[in-house]
Amino acid sequence: MNKILVSWYFALFFCVFTALGQDSGSVESLLKLAQDNTAFFDTDFSGRYTVVQEKPGEGKNLTEAIMYRRDKTSQWTILVTGPSREKGKGYLQTDGTIWFYDPSDRRFTFTSARDKFQNTNANNSDFAPQFYYRDYQIESAQDVKLGALDCVLFTLNAKIDRVDYPKLKLWVTKKDGLIRKKEDYSLSGQLLRTTAIPSYQIVENNERKYSVPVSMLIVDNLRGKRIGEKMQYERTQISISNVSFSKVDNVVYTKSYLEMMGDL
C-alpha cells in the first residue's frame, strides 16, 4: 500500500512539473523570465496609452494618457491627456503609495493598486511590473497550444495576501517568456478577469531589446449585461505607442509635476 502511495505522489509531482519534458527548475525559470519581461529595472520607460472601455449597450469611452515608469525605485506617473474633461488628472506611485490628482480641486487622494484606472476594467497595478515568480507558487504547469503559439500554462496560487488576485492562470510562450493570456480567479475559483496580449513590439535601447505589448484586452467576467440571448461583458483595450527608454527627469515622479501639468 505504501509503495502505491509513493508511486502516486511521484506521478502527481511528475505531471505538475514535467508535463513539458522539463524539470521543476526550468519551469520556474520560465515563470521568472515572464516576470522579468514585465519590468524595466535598468532604465526609465515612457509611452502613450490609449484606453478604450466598452460597456455592453452603452458604447465606448476613450482615455488617453502618457505613462512614465522608473521600476528600479518603484515609481510611476500617469498623466491623463484626453478627453478634455479628464485632461490634467494624474496618478503617482512613490514611496509605496499611489496618489490620484484631480486638477479641478487641486487635491491628491489616496488610491490603491487594486482600484480601477479611470473607472475602466484595468487595475492601477496593470500598468506596473508583475511579480508572478516572487508572489505566487506554481500549482501546475503544462504544455499547451494557444492558437499557433507553443505555451506553458501555469496555474498559480498566491504566497502572500498583498496581491490583487489569489489565483492566476498564465499562458507563457516557451520561446521568449512573454505572457499571452492571463485569467484572474477568486479564492473560491471564480473567474474574475481575462487578459489577452496577442502581440508585442520590440524596442531597442543601448543595444538592448525590450518587449512591450502592442495592446492588451481586459475582459471583466463579473460586469456585463445580457443582450438578446448572449451575455456580453465589459472590456477595456489598452494600446501602447511612442515607447521610449530614455531617461526621464526626476521631477516627473513628484506631486509638483502633476500640479504643474494640471494647470496647463
Please give the residue ranges for each predicted region.
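Bacterial N-terminal signal peptides
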Residues: 7-17
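Short hydrophobic/aromatic-rich beta-strand segments that constitute the beta-sheet cores
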Residues: 47, 75-80, 98-102, 108-110, ...
